[in-house]
Amino acid sequence: MKFSPIRRSLLALVLAPALAAGFVGSALAQTTLLNVSYDPTRELYQAFNPEFAKHWKAQTGEDLVIKQSHGGAGKQARAVIDGLEADVVTLALAYDIDAIAEQTGKIPADWQKRLAHNSAPYTSTIVFLVRKGNPKGIKDWGDLVKPGVEVITPNPKTSGGARWNYLAAWGYALKQPGGNEQTAQAFVTEL
């Protein structure tokens, strides 16, 4: 089949980029992963991802690009359930992973069984930020319910970190003399 010079030029313009992309793609093996995570891990993964990419390259010979999506853990879980194509999910609570497993089937329902004691591989540290000089003398959970003290924390319905805050406050109340479910409920309600 003969093509006019104009058609040949048009075909060259259309096919050249496609062919070049195919050759470049095969020459540069690359994997891209999306890690859907919760807000406090942003800086952790900014430091971790380049080191993991080096390890991946050494193990596989492939370049690795890791993309991040951060937000409240509950909202991130909902996004995955609603179709966000995550390759890795690193959320604050097992509850969020369970919801993804139950509603999408993309994670085995018994995912925790692969770890000792059905563990979730995360910990969390609660930190109290106070005004300069700590004028109200806040040192422990009990200080947070003193008159004049206000607590600012994210919503536990959408934030895994806030759920840890809630659970830590509950645990504190349980460990107080006479602590039980009722006193813990009263404490977190007052808080």
Task: Pin down the residues of each PLM region.
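Local alpha-helix boundary/kink/capping signal
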Residues: 18, 22-23, 46
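Ligand-binding pocket segment of bilobal, Venus flytrap-like solute-binding proteins
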Residues: 176-191
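Active-site cradle of extracellular carbohydrate-active enzymes
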Residues: 161-166
